[in-house]
């Protein structure tokens, strides 16, 4: 067995049927999203808050999907979801994520000029937006590390390859 620290425990295939263990980081992320939208501190969130909390975690649920999810987990029939119910819901949703699609979503955030590649300029912009104080040299090293074809930019396949090496996906 390998260490779970930093390694994703999400299944690599789409919608693997077995129960998935979340990393501590994922649990924390889910807890923060829940707390953020439990504005009255009741320990529960309603359908509208559930939708916003899921959006904060990178999901885009439809109204009908929200209704069905609440019906599935709302054992006490209150019409709202407590943290344990939300956690079990999000554990299932995270297991259904397609890692390749998640990586490509991230790629598109970097590639804001839609060239199909991540340039030095793209990387620098994202670094600034995230408040990372990286030097130009460090940013260039990141590009050099991922750039397999030597064109000075990172294409989708190069990005997917480097992201898979990180064990985040």
Curated annotation (Swiss-Prot):
Q: Which GO terms describe its molecular function?
A: calcium ion binding; NAD(P)H oxidase H2O2-forming activity
Q: Where in the cell is it found?
A: Cytoplasm, Cytoskeleton, Microtubule organizing center, Centrosome
**Cellular component per GO?**
myosin II complex
Record-listed Ca(2+) 1 binding positions: 38, 40, 42, 44, 49
Reply yes or no: does the keyword tRNA processing apply: no
Q: Does the keyword Ribosomal protein apply?
A: no
Q: Which residues bind Ca(2+) 2?
A: 74, 76, 78, 80, 85
Matching entries from Pfam families are given as: EF-hand_7
Keywords attached to this entry: Calcium, Cytoplasm, Cytoskeleton, Metal-binding, Repeat
Region: Disordered; residue ranges are: 1-25
Q: Which InterPro entries match?
A: CALM/Myosin/TropC-like (IPR050230), EF-hand-dom_pair (IPR011992), EF_Hand_1_Ca_BS (IPR018247), EF_hand_dom (IPR002048), RNA-helicase_DEAD-box_CS (IPR000629)
Q: Present the record's domain note.
A: EF-hand 1 and EF-hand 2 domains bind Ca(2+); the binding induces a conformational change which facilitates the interaction with other proteins. EF-hand 3 and EF-hand 4 domains do not bind Ca(2+). The C-terminus can bind to other proteins in a Ca(2+)-independent manner; the binding disrupts and/or prevents homooligomerization.
Entry function: Acts as a calcium sensor. Part of the centrosome outer core complex.
Summary of subunit composition and partner proteins: Monomer. Homooligomerizes in a Ca(2+)-dependent manner. Interaction via the C-terminus with other proteins disrupts and/or prevents homooligomerization. Interacts with SFI1.
The similarity comment for this entry is: Belongs to the centrin family.
Query: What is this protein identified as?
Result: Centrin-1
Organism placement in taxonomy: Eukaryota, Sar, Alveolata, Apicomplexa, Conoidasida
